[in-house]
Curated annotation (Swiss-Prot):
The keyword Lipoprotein does not apply. InterPro entries: EPHD, JmjC_dom, JMJD2A_ePHD, JmjN, KDM4-like_Tudor, Tudor, Tudor_KDM4A_rpt1, Tudor_KDM4A_rpt2. Widely expressed. One of its GO terms (molecular function) is zinc ion binding. It comes from Mus musculus (Mouse). 2-oxoglutarate binds at Y132, N198, K206, K241. Its cofactor is Fe(2+). The gene is Kdm4a. GO terms for cellular component: cytosol; fibrillar center; nucleoplasm; pericentric heterochromatin. Residues 528-537 have a biased composition (Polar residues). Residues 897-954, 955-1011 form the Tudor domain. This is Lysine-specific demethylase 4A. The modification N-acetylalanine is found at A2.
Length: 1064
């Protein structure tokens, strides 16, 4: 049958069906029929019902229907990759929603054809967030309508409610969706990879995009490549319905897809593991729910579910396997039932249509139909009282709502003053006020996807066609080149508002004399040369700043360096202007050439890295002062005392450091930048250099912590190489050690081909015998280095964390182009080493939280334990400084201090505020954890909540034992016992004498850092018992200053006493 099914719809096109009224009557049978025609291969199909069929006579009476939780969809991103945040709004009626949707601010723009509207959608996705009336529980079908009634489809999914009495809102009950222009549903498959049905009752059309199930893994790999941070947090992060990827990006990476427009009165059917997304053209109303066939059972057994939220939809497959796959039930329970899903095969119910290869005819035989399996579930539907929904524990299919709006999203983003007019839709640049949620680390401005929308008329070509010119075009920005980042008064749109300078601004008219006039300059030529170089450094930069502002000429003011004997001549303004012009020209050329393969260019003479080298001759012997020596005793800095670049080179110290780091998981010098994050998040690694884990010799392969995107992202380019060089199928990579300096790296992180991975392998620096070369982007030695511009060297980890650094040869991870790093980034001072060095050196990164100015070198931050983790595109690394460390994260990882009776603590009072209180008594209570039959869970049950046995007398049930649980709604539900958890409880007493029993998570010691939510509700008294309210000393205030009447109005002045008498 496989070969037969492959001939059906081989191009995986979205198919449209027009059933007759007779064919339309049996829903499950018609679904089986369209699968026999190959409709399921596209992942999406359209069904146009007979003209005589209507689910509702009129929709004029629904204006008072309440939309309880509308969501405003705030979209951030660029270049075809977006993240959608749902912000819940107050309830409104359909009448109010329609009025908003049809207003000038939210209405559909004018368009002549669908392709034009589609282009406007993707270009203006981040502007003017629309409101979506999603997830409204209910149906608009009239009661007498039996055909394709979304409220009672009578498929095998109804067994969930029949067997367990469980209803899951939006899954086996219908949901209504009220849309407006630009409201979107992000890329996702259905919960548990079920089927879904969507009927558009009335209003404007809805556009759909679909990826065939057989190519779903490719879409997941693409999404994980662009959003590695989300992928690490949750394997099934696309189920969050927050990721929007444009069809242009799909075509660019060769992922097959198709698109279709759903008109009012039409059905859309999605199939298991069919990724789909789309948007509404204007005000409309749709109704949808999920259903299942026998083919789905295998998908449900293998579905990868969201792991970051326990209340996500999960359906127990036990009843389905037991009923429809009895021969495999025991194997499945033992975890040995493994089967590869063939996405091309239709559902078993389609066998009758494949036998005769004819059309859909009335069924003559008595062949079993899914309807009959669940017929009993519908009997007595009206007479029986339905079991109430346990709202606290049953997952519902709802859009993921942001509980807290990201702090970087301003109010102006949520409620822009005015929408783009029709003439502004061709804008290619996002306004400065509409920045992404996370501020950009790059000096390159965020640019909207301005590419012409391609024609996808033939999806078969989409599979193989590779776009050759998919790159952000910036022809319109020639008047404003990238060198604007050199201006000291950098605007936030250019640098993301994140490059903060500790020094004051220097005037562009400063002369060389004012910057380098040193009366005590010695007469030897070496010293004089260093003075000239210092003068060149400051004046060079200032002159370029003048050009960046568009002055058109260099700053005025004659050089006034006092020449001493053999001192070289000073640099003229004309030469500096030539340097600036040369640098500006190179920037423009670099922007227009292909990013990944362009050769390394030499750095301009005025570049900070060149100037640092020029002025470093007199600082190579820089010694630490006694005060600075004392600082080296800090815990994180002590092992690095011999590795600072301002100390004499010490190759043996580097080698010893590399050997120590090789012993620590993940045993790779490059992956170490994410070590702190994995320590805190997963508790996987040792805490200090001294705690060596397994010997390096025994560890030949480990899984790299750095996603491939970190090596390929360059700020604004979406050119990601999806291939991961030198990685095994299980995701691990070989570890290799340099025989000379002992640095240990993954072959994939350092770009070591398997042929070269041997005991004789040497790193690039040792191969070039450049043992005294240091990283030009930081201030520490040791680690894995690669060659950069002008024969300089950089740490691979520094190049990964600095967004603007670029790996020219991605596979070999070298050379590294640092010419695109904005000059203001070199002005930042590292908070860790600024006291250890007499001069500023290297290039810093900054904390990613808001506009936090905290800056540090990558290597310093890694050594000090700053948390760095993979971020989502267009960023690379998300950095959390010590000021923004989340207290809850530390508390959750076992860092809680012990508490004793009589200790003063802070806890939550019954009035909802936090007060200081005293621990009176410590007790231990036992809570039970169970998994309910519907897939939900509870971990805070009391023993008396188990009604199937007396747990107070007999103790907890055995693990895995089936139990009956009485829930808070009074109903009894089936569940399986997981474990019992003895929890330490604390009885605390407040100042007003009231006492509460709380868990450790709800108690804060006086030494702990309080979360913001606690600080904002912290008070010093309980129930009006204020400290010293009657004994507080009276505050003496100065008498009011006597008012002096203006002489011009003295005659008009009336004494207050006289005024009151007149008024009386």
């Amino acid at each position: 049958m496989a070969s037969e099914s492959e001939t059906l719809n081989p191009s995986a096109r979205i198919m449209t069906f027009y059933p007759t009224m007779e064919e339309f009557r049996n829903f499950s049978r018609y679904i089986a029929y369209i699968e026999s025609q190959g409709a399921h291969r596209a992942g999406l199909a359209k069904v146009v019902p007979p003209k005589e069929w209507k689910p509702r006579t009129s929709y004029d009476d629904i204006d008072d229907l309440v939309i309880p939780a509308p969501i405003q969809q705030l979209v951030t991103g660029q270049s075809g990759l977006f993240t959608q945040y749902n912000i819940q709004k107050k309830a409104m009626t359909v009448r109010e929603f329609r009025k908003i949707a049809n207003s000038d601010k939210y209405c559909t723009p004018r368009y002549s054809e669908f392709e034009e509207l589609e282009r406007k959608y993707w270009k203006n996705l981040t502007f003017n967030p629309p409101i979506y009336g999603a997830d409204v529980n209910g149906t608009l079908y009239e009661q007498h309508v039996d055909e394709w009634n979304i409220g009672r489809l009578k498929t095998i999914l109804d067994l969930v409610e029949k067997e367990s009495g469980i209803t899951i809102e939006g899954v086996n009950t219908p949901y209504l969706y009220f849309g407006m222009w630009k409201t979107s549903f992000a890329w996702h498959t259905e919960d548990m990879d079920l089927y879904s049905i969507n009927y558009l009752h009335f209003g404007e059309p809805k556009s759909w995009y679909s990826v065939p199930p057989e190519h779903g893994k490719r879409l997941e790999r693409l999404a994980k490549g662009f959003f590695p941070g989300s992928a690490q947090s949750c394997e099934a992060f696309l189920r969050h319905k927050m990721t929007l990827i444009s069809p242009l990006m799909l075509k660019k990476y060769g992922i097959p897809f198709d698109k279709v427009t759903q008109e009012a009165g039409e059905f859309m059917i999605t199939f298991p593991y069919g990724y789909h997304a789309g948007f509404n053209h204007g005000f409309n109303c749709a109704e949808s729910t999920n259903f299942a066939t026998r083919r789905w059972i295998e998908y449900g057994k293998q579905a990868v579910l969201c792991s970051c939220r326990k209340d996500m939809v999960k359906i127990s497959m036990d009843v389905f396997v037991r009923r429809f796959q009895p021969e495999r039930y025991k194997l499945w329970k033992a975890g040995k039932d493994s089967m590869v899903i063939d996405h091309t095969l239709p559902t078993p119910e389609a066998a009758e249509f494949l036998k005769d290869s004819g059309g859909l005819t009335p069924r003559a035989g008595s062949e079993e139909c899914p309807e009959e399996d669940v017929e009993a579930a519908d009997q007595g539907e009206e007479g029986d009282v339905k079991r109430s929904l346990a709202k606290h524990r049953i997952g519902t299919k709802r859009h993921r709502v942001c509980l807290e709006i990201p702090q970087e999203v301003s109010q102006s983003e949520l409620f822009p003053k005015e929408e783009l007019s029709s003439g502004q839709y061709e804008m290619t640049e996002c306004p400065a006020t509409l920045a992404p949620v996370r501020p950009t680390h790059s000096s390159v401005r965020q640019v909207e996807d301005s590419l012409p929308f391609p024609d996808y008329s033939d999806p078969t070509e989409v599979k193989f066609e590779e776009l050759k010119n998919v790159k952000l075009e910036e022809e319109d920005e020639e008047d404003e080149p990238e060198a604007a980042a050199l201006d000291l008064s950098v605007n936030p749109a250019s640098v993301g508002g994140r490059l903060v300078f500790s020094g004051s601004k220097k005037k562009s008219s400063s002369s060389l004399g004012s910057t380098s006039s040193q009366d005590s300059v010695s007469s030897d030529s070496e010293t004089a040369e260093s003075v000239s170089c210092q003068g060149q450094e400051k004046t060079g930069v200032l002159t370029v700043h003048s050009y960046a502002r568009g002055d058109g000429k260099a700053a005025t003011g004659e050089p006034s360096v006092k020449k001493k004997r053999s001192a070289p001549r000073s640099i003229s303004e004309q030469e500096l202007a030539e340097v600036a012009d040369e640098y500006m020209l190179s920037l423009e050329e670099n922007k227009k050439t292909k990013g990944r393969r362009q050769p390394l260019s030499k750095l301009p003479r005025h570049h900070p890295l060149v100037l640092q080298e020029c002025g470093s001759d007199d600082e190579t012997s820089e010694q630490l002062t006694p005060e600075e020596e004392a600082e080296e005793t800090e815990a994180w800095a002590k092992p690095l005392s011999q590795l600072w670049q301002n100390r004499p080179p010490n190759f043996e110290a580097e080698k010893e450091f590399n050997e120590i780091m090789a012993q620590q998981a993940p045993h790779c010098a490059v992956c170490m930048i994410f070590q702190t994050y994995h320590q805190v998040e997963f508790g996987a690694f040792s805490q200090s250099c001294g705690d060596a884990s397994e010997p390096a010799a025994q560890t030949q392969r480990t899984k790299p912590l750095i996603p491939e995107m970190c090596f390929t992202t360059t700020g604004c380019s979406t050119d990601i190489n999806l291939s991961t060089p030198y990685l095994e199928e299980d995701g691990t990579s070989m570890l290799v050690s340099c025989k000379k300096c002992s640095v240990r790296v993954h072959a994939s992180c350092y770009g070591v081909p398997p042929a070269k991975a041997s005991e004789e392998w040497m790193c690039s620096r040792c191969s070039a015998n450049a043992l005294e070369e240091d990283c030009c982007l930081c201030s520490l030695r040791g680690g894995a280095l690669q060659r950069a511009n002008d024969d300089r060297w950089v740490h691979v980890s520094c190049a990964v964390a600095i967004l603007e650094a670029r790996f020219v040869n991605i596979a070999e991870r070298s050379p590294v182009d640092v010419s695109k790093i904005p000059l203001p980034r070199f002005k930042l001072k590292c908070v860790f080493c600024k006291k250890r060095r007499k001069r500023n050196a290297g290039c810093c990164v900054q904390c990613s939280h808001g506009r936090c100015p905290t800056a540090f070198h990558v290597s310093c931050a890694q050594a000090a334990g700053v948390m760095m983790q993979p971020d989502d595109w267009p960023f690379v690394v998300f950095i959390t400084c010590f000021r923004h460390k989340i207290p809850n994260l530390e508390r959750a990882k076992g860092a809680l201090l012990s508490i004793t009776a009589g200790q003063k603590v802070i806890s939550k009072h019954k009035n909802g505020r936090f007060y200081q209180c005293e621990v009176v008594r410590l007790t231990t209570e036992t809570f039970y954890e169970v998994n309910f039959d519907d897939g939900s869970f509870s971990d805070n049950l009391y023993p008396e909540d188990i009604v199937s046995q007396d747990c107070l007398q007999l103790g907890p049930p055995a693990e895995g034992e089936v139990v009956q649980v009485r829930w808070t709604d009074g109903q009894v539900y089936g569940a399986k016992f997981v474990a019992s958890h003895p929890i330490q409880m604390y009885q605390v007493e407040f100042e007003d004498g009231s006492q509460l029993v709380v868990k450790r998570d709800d108690v804060y010691t006086l030494d702990e850092e309080l979360p913001k939510r606690v600080k904002s509700r912290l008070s010093v008294a309980s129930d009006m018992r204020f400290n010293e309210i009657f004994t507080e000393k009276e505050v003496k205030q100065e008498k009011k200053r006597q008012r002096v009447i203006n002489s011009r109005y003295r005659e008009d002045y009336i004494e207050p006493a006289l005024y009151r008498a007149i008024m009386e």
